[in-house]
């Protein structure tokens, strides 16, 4: 029996019309008036998106990614992205994943909470400044005192208004932590980067590159990336998971999800295959440069959660009545 070779498409934008238990029925804008079938709910391919299909509405924009087309013209995508022009922040999406589980409600809870000028956020900003100083140090070693003076010039209001720093003991602990992160970044950039297992070249790096990924409907900013996109680092000044395994420190779930999404962004926006990427989580507290790996099934689960958030946002706008939001 002759095997028919399936056609493959990287990305396809379609309009949703309706669905049944096995297929979506869609139209390709500006092509023709033909209705196409999209197979969903296939185990190991796109089953992660099945429970969102009832949330789709007529005329919704969908991105179909990594699509195979069989001999009958039926589309079978690996990703189904609802309203991809709604660019969700990667950090906000990753925060839906907590130690106790994940839920789209975490996204809305975070949006309703006031933004606090808290110690962890301030420490993270200062740690990013330390990274800048060590990466761009050209022939001289950054001085801690001079760098902290720069931090005071850059964050004067935040430092003055942080309630945690009004207590003398907490203030001392904060600046002790600043010194610790400075020293750890010094060791990481000057020594760990040069180790054979990492091979990181700070002279050919970009700090804080921003990306918009329309295929997946997300956007974000990395902390460190090699110019050839072979390697990137996401830095965290907080604690890792110290409890799941008593013998080692592991990345927290939200941090791990963040890395998955950055890998997907580089693949779909920059055509950099995830198999060739070397992503690392840098926990400056320890310090620990942790290699992060992923499976596409995990990424699909995160994008599926994104779809549920987008569907809720659009539902609130379209209904605009308390009977829907109660």
Segments predicted by a language model, with ranges:
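A non-catalytic, helix-rich entry segment at domain boundaries
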Residues: 130-207
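A residue-level signal for conserved active-site and pocket-lining positions in enzyme catalytic cores
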Residues: 99, 127-128, 224, 262
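Structural detector for short beta-strands of small beta-barrel domains
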Residues: 1-30
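Cysteine-cluster motifs in flexible loop/terminal segments that predominantly coordinate metals
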Residues: 99-103, 317-326
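Mg2+/Mn2+-dependent nuclease catalytic core
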Residues: 28-57, 200-314
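Flexible glycine-rich surface loops and low-complexity tracts that mediate binding to linear polymers
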Residues: 51-77
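Short, amphipathic alpha-helical segments that act as regulatory/interfacial helices
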Residues: 124-135, 263, 267
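Extended, charge-rich, solvent-exposed interface segments
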Residues: 74-123, 129
């Amino acid at each position: 029996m002759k095997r028919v070779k399936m056609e493959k498409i990287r990305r396809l934008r379609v309009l949703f019309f309706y669905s049944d238990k096995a297929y979506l029925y869609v139209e390709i804008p500006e092509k023709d008036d033909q209705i196409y079938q999209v197979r969903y709910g296939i185990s190991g391919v796109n089953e992660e998106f099945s429970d969102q299909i009832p949330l789709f509405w007529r005329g919704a924009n969908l991105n179909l990614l990594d699509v195979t087309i069989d001999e009958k013209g039926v589309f079978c995508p690996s990703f189904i992205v609802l309203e991809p022009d709604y660019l969700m922040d990667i950090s906000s999406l990753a925060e839906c994943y907590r130690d106790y589980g994940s839920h789209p409600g975490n996204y809305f809870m975070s949006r309703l909470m006031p933004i606090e000028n808290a110690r962890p956020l301030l420490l993270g900003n200062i740690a990013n400044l330390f990274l800048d100083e060590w990466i761009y140090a050209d022939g001289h070693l950054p001085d801690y005192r001079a760098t902290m003076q720069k931090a005071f010039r850059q964050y004067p209001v935040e430092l003055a208004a942080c309630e945690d720093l009004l207590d003398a003991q907490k203030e001392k602990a904060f600046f002790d932590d600043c010194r610790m992160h400075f020293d750890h970044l010094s060791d990481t950039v000057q020594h760990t980067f040069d180790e054979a297992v990492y091979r990181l070249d700070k002279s050919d790096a970009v700090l804080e590159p921003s990306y918009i990924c329309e295929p997946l409907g997300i956007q974000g900013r990395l902390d460190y990336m090699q110019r050839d996109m072979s390697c990137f680092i996401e830095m965290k000044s907080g604690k890792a998971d110290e409890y799941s395994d008593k013998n080692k420190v592991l990345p927290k779930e939200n941090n791990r999800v963040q890395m998955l999404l950055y890998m997907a962004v580089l693949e779909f926006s920059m055509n950099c295959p995830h198999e060739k990427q070397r992503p690392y989580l840098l926990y400056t507290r320890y310090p620990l440069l942790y290699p992060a790996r992923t499976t596409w099934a995990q990424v699909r689960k995160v994008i599926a959660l994104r779809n549920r958030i987008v569907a809720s946002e659009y539902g609130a706008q379209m209904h605009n009545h308390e009977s829907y939001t109660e």
